[in-house]
């Protein structure tokens, strides 16, 4: 329901330039529990992401979403973490960044971008904001 009201809100208030959804897949995982609801969950997630992507395009706003990650305990080599939501989230995203923390340093890896190869950036979070290490 909230998502359906988004277009009306964007028409009404042209000052909105950024939409942030924290934990985009979390609500769908809570609402559609178990493997038996996987198809419904993925369909509704795809619908939500489509509405967000179209709203961003038609109303010239940036859309940023965070997502959950899972771990594959059977993976023996490499990073066992993966993005929750499968291909639907991957295909709906223009840029995908993977963040990780090591001590006080933070790392951002651009794992999918239409204009750049995979790259890493190191940064610090301080009281003043984001800073170079």
Ranges and model annotations:
Residues 37-45:
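Residue-level preference for long, well-ordered alpha-helices that form the structural scaffold
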Residues 1-37:
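Conserved inter-motif catalytic segment of the P-loop NTP-binding fold
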Residues 43, 50-133:
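Phosphate-binding/switch region of NTP-binding enzymes
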